[in-house]
């Protein structure tokens, strides 16, 4: 467990975190994506981040959680070379927590001898990842229902080893 600031603590995901992580992801999807994506796309995001997927990613990768005063405020996962499920509770966004989580996930990737990370960025997240040095590899458009498209970006970043 690592103290980030006087109020924040980061640690590895435990299975006992599952309900809170799923609730955080669902809430963040509802507040951040509903304004930019049509309803079926929001439903698609909910299905993509269901409990079995969260458990599988945590078991095969590196998932972290961030707490403040005992309340979960953020989570992020690296599964192999892919970053997934980086979510910060809406009330806690724009405080550097997402950037801190990405630094933690990138550091763990370097420790695992991974030199490049990739991710799929939603429309609201694209600028965040660009600021962190990720580059757009491709623009994607997936029709989840007639006339309802999931637009997103495949992005990647070469990690600089400290050596």
Where are these regions (language model features)?
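Conserved acetyl-CoA binding element of GNAT-fold acetyltransferases
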Residues: 79-91, 99
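A short beta-loop-alpha structural element at the N-terminal edge
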Residues: 8-23
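C-terminal "cap" of GNAT-fold acetyltransferases
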Residues: 115, 120-124, 132, 142-163
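Conserved acetyl-CoA-binding loop-helix of GNAT-fold acetyltransferases
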Residues: 94-107, 131
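Conserved GNAT-fold acetyl-CoA-binding loop/helix
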Residues: 22, 26-52
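Conserved beta-hairpin
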Residues: 61-74
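Residue-level recognition of the GNAT/N-acetyltransferase active site
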Residues: 14, 84, 89, 120-122
């Amino acid at each position: 467990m690592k103290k980030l600031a006087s109020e924040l603590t980061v640690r590895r995901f435990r299975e006992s975190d599952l309900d809170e992580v799923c609730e955080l992801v669902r809430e963040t999807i509802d507040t951040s994506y509903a304004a930019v994506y049509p309803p079926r796309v929001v439903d698609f995001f909910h299905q993509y981040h269901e409990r079995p997927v969260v458990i599988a990613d945590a078991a095969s990768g590196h998932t972290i959680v961030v707490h403040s005063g005992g309340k979960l405020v953020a989570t992020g996962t690296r599964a192999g070379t892919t970053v997934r499920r980086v979510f910060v509770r809406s009330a806690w966004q724009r405080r550097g927590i997402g950037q801190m989580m990405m630094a933690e996930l990138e550091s763990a990737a370097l420790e695992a001898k991974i030199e490049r990370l990739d991710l799929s960025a939603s429309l609201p997240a694209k600028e965040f990842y660009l600021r962190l040095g990720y580059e757009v590899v491709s623009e994607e458009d997936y029709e989840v229902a007639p006339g309802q498209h999931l637009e997103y970006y495949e992005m990647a970043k070469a990690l600089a080893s400290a050596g």
